[in-house]
Curated annotation (Swiss-Prot):
SUPFAM superfamilies in UniProt: Alpha-macroglobulin receptor domain, Terpenoid cyclases/Protein prenyltransferases
The protein's name: Thioester-containing protein 1 allele R1
Signal peptide (UniProt feature, chain positions): 1-21
Glycosylation sites: N68, N199, N242, N312, N481, N637, N728, N813, N919, N1065
PROSITE patterns: ALPHA_2_MACROGLOBULIN (PS00477)
Recorded phenotype for the gene knockout or disruption: In RNAi-mediated knockdown females infected with parasite P.berghei, causes an increase in the number of parasite oocysts in the midgut and a loss of ookinete melanization.
Natural source organism: Anopheles gambiae (African malaria mosquito)
Main location, first listed in the record: secreted
Length: 1338
């Protein structure tokens, strides 16, 4: 439908010059690579034609000519002439003007300045969601358009950057190529990114084109929404707010629950609180206590927390409810902005209620002092008090006052117009507007017209013009064809000369469509979850189409992520908009006049009000389990077919909700097309299940699994609900152990949620599938869903790994016996044993790159475990010439995520700190700086200036002696401690600078000064840890003492001849040994390095990592560098595995460098024997684990737990106190972590910690595993008591609860720890079971 709207703004600026019967009209703006059209009208009755010379010229500010175009034209009497100029592509900013000179005796000279517009392209960004969780993928599209909303031919690529909330560059595409004006890509958000508002920006030729934000946060997508609105308009005299609360699922059905309403007044203090039960809709009255307003209206904050019945899911809505002093408002409606002295002026006072309805019966006195007008009157049924005022010739201003009997007061001033004539012309639309159909306009003038000229303007230029001769009539029917060139918006201007004055009128045409008439529709508005939906598209053949669909619930966060019709209008207006001035219509139209003294321009062309005109507007069927619960989907690109249409069939997700579907299209010729508004459809079933399952449970506990049934069929039915025992993972309490399913029946009335539950125990650890099916009407209506909950061990898991490494340069045969160390007190049935054969040293590491360490990684140093190993793996894969592209891609993607994570810890001075808001650390900045520099060769996102600034900060921290001392908290004593002359930290910083070629050159003096300090300290270094790092630094520097240092280091080592192992027995043996191995590699002592490598390999964890982050970093680095020298490309060997009375064989060749072989071993196995024969390289790994109760640990921390009385069965308050037990007085631990695990059924909210001690503050709190575990980080701990209180809430029913535990440990020396168990309420089965589930004793 096309709409015609009268407007005061003309977005195409034009100029008019009229003289000697000549009218010259043209755009005032010029752009590069765009047509410029001038229209000259000859209404001179004396001359049959005029000859003119047109000159378009421009120069830069320094006088350099950039444009000089001339044209000779003639214009015949009573005709128009359209002259086109093509602006060059390379037009630049400057001073431009157009000159019109008469020729061949015709005296005429006019010139006008033109304004150069540099903006010739614009951009849009579409994101698939407004908000993302850590670990999500952000899909986005960039759309680039020219002034005609088409893909710009000259722009082939754009520069796209994504930044985190601290403006760190996380990802960039320096040459993002456009296809049909579109660039599409995605960003994998890291699992622990910086939360907050992120930014996508697009640049073209160094200037920002467009940007858009999205949010990264932890959130749960609500299944329902709550609306809070006044039941009646609140007035001060009511002294109350009456609210209506509506709660509906996104698919339209009402929600049952409890609404908690809180009213705040005066500095946001809680004044009133009420609760009410709501089923879909409810009302509540909140009364004030002497509420007095200072203004005519005041916002009152109201908070509504709606808790869904049965599930306890909660939606919180905070609203500002406006209270008014009076029941109505008033506006002055004028026939024109200004009045004409001596002529009647019509206006009206429009009274409306605050809901927009007319306010009739409002009485009061109207006074207009300037014309001595006074009356007492009442508003009519339309809320109007109509006035006709008679200003005299001398009236300068009308001051209109209204005083109501209830004290309401209003006034407004109206100014007179500076008039030059009483004549006017008017343009009115008289027909609907349709593409390629005639538009009918009525042109009316107060004088008989001999001619008038019309101009059609769109997209910054005049696209049509005409010279009409009405034969001296005051009215004329103008008919114009609505062409595609006018789309999407155009303006029509008419002008004539009446009484030596140019009078004019204009109209805006808003087509409400685009030249690319793209359309999108679906075959059903309601569809069952998981079923297929058909999309029908029509548009220009071959055009690009971008589709997106997302859960309507996401709009509760924001809706700016998507593209809408209104966005396209804003882009179009952005090219052509100018400022409005309601009192200077020529200014608003972009007009200026060039006339002789006897031809004037009318300054008031609005004689009547400009009102908008709207014209012409089966039984036994296979049950599908719902498992796909995406929040956004259908992010897809397609092309329109040759026929101009395209159909697409897609499967909708399994979520029961409402969806928004949007689509746009781009054609190179016809430009952009987009649907008018998003298509909304609902995935709903007449009968369905909603689950409310816990995140995790412990094995052996009795747990209630809660479901809710909904019936929308209009009648009550008996439902059969079946819970399945999938893979024998589940035990139904009170039922035979052999049952594979359990069915219950329940009556389900229409439109009411009916709860049903099952009491179960989990038999096996790991992920347990919960599969449930419900049916009514003998199976004609069914629903089924499957979800996974985690089954945790009742004891602590004890992982173990025995590794044997072999490297045969020639054919050999060797046997490796392995005895398993399984504790005799291990829980029965908990032992798992696996044999792995890896022909590649890093196969296990690559497999576990995304979870190398089992401990938390919530600080700036620990977080690097998500970054550095990926670099080492990529180095290794490239060094051995791996062709496994999927492994390279995995490591590269994880490297990008690790980079994202690490940027959270960057400080404003360029350094990196342990926490997000803290001082920079010398140790960590050195570590991050050198790692980032190395990573640049694999990801281009890293900002070189950022790395340089970090290393500059590092260099600035050097002591005049050459040493480096710690800055920031001490959390790694061996590295940061200053008791041994800072040798370790100084060596570490030098190592970072030496491994960075740019820093090595830039900070050569710093390096030289540091190496001098190390060489001066060399004689006194008697700690193997210090010496290992110093030796590696000397190797990197090529120092003259490097060989002496290595020999001294070797002398400090320990040798296990039976295992062919060499290591250094310090407080940090893995780091020390790894640095030593790096020095062996640098010295090319590969044979001597094999025993060192053997020992390191045998210290690895199951994931291929080492106990802590620094162990892992330097350990993997050393093994990688060594492995690069021992290529598996010559592998050709056979492996025989013997255990008990069984044997397995493996044949390995050089083609299998990335293949892992494994065998599950019976749990009662105590020893294995492995024989290897052949040539090559490999790792033999026996991975096993068992569960052990938490008893008899030797505590190195004091740990105290106290359960506090809350007076509620649903709230747990646990006071935790911990302190370090030093072996020497006043010594402190390294970084200390406290992990609190909660009993099954309990979870924490977002801010669970209170009452913490201040002496040694908590640096970070991390909520894990769905709120069932909380980790607290301390810089370190001493003998002081470090206390806090944790609050958790029971959300699920669990009986036979296993004890929970709290553990505190030193992060860099996990042998220093303490652990305590605690228990909460002793619920038994009889307290939580339904009658039919309860055992006989209940």
């Amino acid at each position: 439908m096309w709409q015609f709207i009268r407007s005061r703004i003309l977005t195409v600026i034009i100029f008019i010059g009229a003289a000697h019967g000549l009218l010259v009209v043209g755009p005032k703006f010029i752009r590069a690579n765009q047509e410029y059209t001038l229209v000259i009208s000859n209404f001179n009755s004396q001359l049959s034609k005029v000859d003119l010379l047109l000159k378009l010229e421009g120069e830069t500010d320094n006088g350099l000519s950039v444009l000089n175009v001339t044209k000779m034209v003639d214009v015949r009497r009573n005709m128009n002439r359209m002259i086109n100029f093509n602006m060059p592509e390379d037009l630049t900013a400057g001073n431009y003007k157009i000159t019109i000179d008469g020729q061949r005796g015709f005296s005429f000279h006019k010139e006008a300045e033109l304004v150069y517009l540099s903006k010739s392209i614009s951009g849009l960004i579409q994101v698939d969601k407004p908000v993302f969780k850590p670990g999500d993928t952000v899909n986005f599209r960039v759309i680039v358009l020219d002034t005609e909303l088409k893909p710009p031919a000259r722009v082939k690529s754009v520069y796209v950057t994504i930044r985190d909330p601290q403006r760190n560059v996380i990802r960039k595409w320096s040459t993002a190529k456009l296809y049909a004006g579109v660039f599409e890509s995605d960003l994998q958000i890291a699992p622990t990114p910086m939360l907050g508002v992120w930014n996508i920006s697009v640049e073209v030729e160094g200037e920002e084109l467009v940007s858009k934000t999205f949010e990264v946060k932890e959130y749960v997508l609500s299944t329902f929404d709550v609306q809070v609105m006044p039941s009646v308009i609140p007035l001060e005299e009511h002294q109350a707010v009456n609210l209506t609360i509506e709660a509906n699922y996104h698919f339209g059905k009402p929600v049952q629950g409890v609404a908690k309403v809180e009213l705040y007044l005066d500095d946001d203090k809680l004044k009133l609180k009420k609760e009410l039960t709501v089923y879909g809709k409810g009302q509540v009255e909140l009364r004030f206590d002497n509420f007095a307003m200072d203004a005519d209206q005041q916002d009152v904050p109201v908070k509504v927390s709606f808790v869904e019945q049965y599930t306890n899911r909660t939606v919180v809505k905070q609203s500002q409810i406006t209270v008014y002093r009076y029941a109505y408002r008033v506006e002055l409606i004028k026939e024109s902005p200004q009045f004409r002295p001596g002529l009647p002026f019509k206006c009206a006072l429009q009274f409306t209620h605050h809901d927009g309805t007319p306010a009739k019966g409002i009485s009061g006195k109207v006074e207009v002092s300037d014309v001595r007008f006074e009356t007492t009157t009442t508003s009519d049924n339309d809320g109007l008090i109509k006035l006709e005022l008679q200003p005299s010739e001398g009236t300068e201003q009308l001051s209109i006052h209204f005083n109501a009997v209830d004290g309401f007061f209003f006034y407004e001033d109206v100014n007179k117009v500076e008039t030059v004539t009483d004549a006017y012309i008017k343009l009115e639309l008289k027909s609907p507007i349709k593409r390629n159909k005639l538009m009918r306009f009525m042109v009316t003038c107060t004088e008989r017209m001999t001619f008038f000229v019309y101009y059609v303007m769109s997209k910054g230029n005049i696209i049509d013009a005409g010279f009409m001769r009405p034969n001296k009539q005051p009215k004329y029917l103008l008919q114009l064809n609505a062409t595609e060139k006018m789309i999407p918006r155009a303006k029509i201007l008419i002008a004539t000369v009446a009484g030596r004055t140019v009078v004019y009128d204009f109209a805006d045409l808003d087509f409400q469509e685009l030249r690319n008439n793209f359309d999108l529709s679906i075959d059903e508005q309601e569809i069952k979850p998981g079923r297929q939906i058909e999309l029908s598209m029509s548009g220009r053949p071959g055009a690009y189409v971008g589709l997106a669909a997302y859960d309507k619930a996401l709009l509760l966060f924001n809706k700016n992520h998507d593209l809408f019709w209104e966005d396209i209008g804003q882009v179009f207006d952005g090219f052509h908009a100018i400022n409005e001035n309601e009192f200077d219509i020529f200014h608003s139209l972009g007009l200026f006049a060039r006339t002789l003294d006897d031809i004037l321009f009318d300054s008031a062309n609005e004689k009547t009000g400009r009102n908008a005109l709207q014209s012409g507007k089966p039984i036994g069927k296979l049950v599908s389990y719902r498992t796909n619960f995406q929040e956004s989907w259908l992010w897809k690109n397609v092309s329109i077919g040759r026929s101009g249409s395209r159909k697409l069939i897609e499967v909708v997700p399994d979520t029961t909700t409402s969806w928004y579907l949007t689509g746009f299209s781009i054609d190179p010729v016809y430009g952009l097309g987009i649907i008018k508004k998003p298509i909304q459809f609902t995935t709903v079933q007449p009968f369905y299940i909603v689950e409310n399952l816990p995140y995790s449970i412990k094995r052996g506990e009795a747990v209630v699994l809660q479901f809710t049934l909904f019936n929308n069929l209009g009648a009550e039915y008996i439902a059969d609900v079946t819970l399945y025992n999938v893979a024998n993972q589940t035990e139904f309490v009170g039922r035979p152990n052999t049952d594979l399913s359990y069915t219950k029946s329940v009556s389900v009335p229409p439109k009411v949620g009916v709860p049903i539950s099952f009491l179960i125990k989990a038999r096996k650890l790991g992920e347990m599938a919960v599969r449930v099916k419900a049916s009514i009407m003998l199976g004609h209506e069914t629903d089924a869903l499957e979800k996974v909950i985690r089954v945790m061990p009742e004891s602590l898991v004890q992982p173990r790994m025995d590794t044997r490494f072999f490297c045969f340069d020639d054919h050999k045969n060797q046997t490796f016996p392995i005895n398993l160390d399984i504790n005799k007190k291990a829980d029965s049935g908990s032992t798992k044993i696996e044999f792995r054969l890896n022909p590649n040293l890093l196969t296990t590491v690559i497999k576990n790159l995304d979870h190398l360490l089992g401990v938390p990684t919530g600080c700036g140093e620990q977080n690097m475990v998500k970054f550095v190993p990926n670099i080492l793996v990529l180095d290794y894969l490239h060094a051995i010439g791996s062709k496994e592209q999927h492994l390279i891609d995995k490591a590269t993607n994880l490297l990008r995520q690790g980079y994202q994570n690490q940027m959270r810890y960057r400080q404003t001075d360029g350094s990196f700190g342990l926490w997000e808001t803290t001082n920079g650390s010398v140790f960590l900045t050195a570590f991050v700086g050198t790692s980032m520099q190395t990573a640049v060769k694999y990801i281009s996102d890293i900002d070189a200036a950022m790395v340089e600034k970090a290393l500059d900060w590092l260099a600035s921290k050097q002591h005049f002696s050459g040493r480096f001392d710690k800055a920031g908290a001490e959390y790694h004593k061996e590295m940061q401690g200053g008791l041994r002359n800072g040798v370790a930290l100084t060596s570490y910083v030098l190592m970072a600078l030496l491994e960075n070629d740019i820093a090595k050159a830039k900070h050569a003096e710093v390096i030289q000064k540091g190496m001098t300090y190390l060489s001066n300290q060399f004689g006194s270094i008697n700690n193997a840890y210090d010496l290992s790092i110093a030796t590696y630094a000397m190797m990197l520097n090529g120092h003259t003492m490097k060989e002496e240092a290595l020999n001294k280091l070797i002398d400090m080592s320990f040798i296990d001849a039976d295992k062919n192992e060499r290591f250094w027995n310090t407080t940090n043996p893995i780091e020390t040994t790894a640095y030593a191995l790096l020095s062996f590699v640098m010295a090319e002592k590969y044979t001597d390095g094999i025993p060192v490598m053997n020992w390191l390999v045998n210290q690895r964890y199951v994931t291929g990592s080492f106990p802590s982050t620094q162990d892992t970093f330097v350990g993997l680095k050393a093994l990688t560098k060594m492995a690069e020298k021992i290529s598996p490309s010559r592998n050709d060997y056979t492996v025989q595995l013997k255990y008990k009375k069984s044997a397995k064989y493996f044949k390995i060749n050089s083609e299998q460098i990335d293949v892992e072989n494994f065998v599950d071993i019976p749990e009662d196995t105590k020893k294995l024997e492995i024989n290897v024969g052949g040539i090559g390289f490999g790792l033999l790994e026996v991975v096993y684990q068992f569960n052990l109760n938490l008893v008899n640990f030797e505590n190195r921390f004091q740990l105290d737990l106290e359960k506090q009385n809350t007076g509620s069965d649903y709230e747990l308050r646990l006071k935790v106190c911990a302190s370090y037990i030093p072996q020497l007085t006043d010594r402190r631990s390294n970084m200390a972590l406290i992990e609190v695990t909660l009993p099954s059924g309990y979870v924490v909210d977002r801010n669970p910690i209170s009452e913490q001690t201040k002496v040694n503050p908590i640096q970070k709190t991390e909520i894990r595993y769905g709120g069932t575990s909380v980790v607290l980080y301390y810089d370190n701990m001493g003998s002081e008591r470090n206390c806090f209180t944790l609050t958790a809430y029971r959300r699920f029913k669990v009986a036979l609860k296993r004890p929970a535990y709290v553990v505190v440990y030193d992060y860099y020396n996990t042998n220093l720890n303490a652990i305590k168990v605690y228990e909460v309420d002793k619920q038994n089965l009889c307290e939580i079971c339904d009658e039919e589930d309860c055992p006989a004793e209940c």
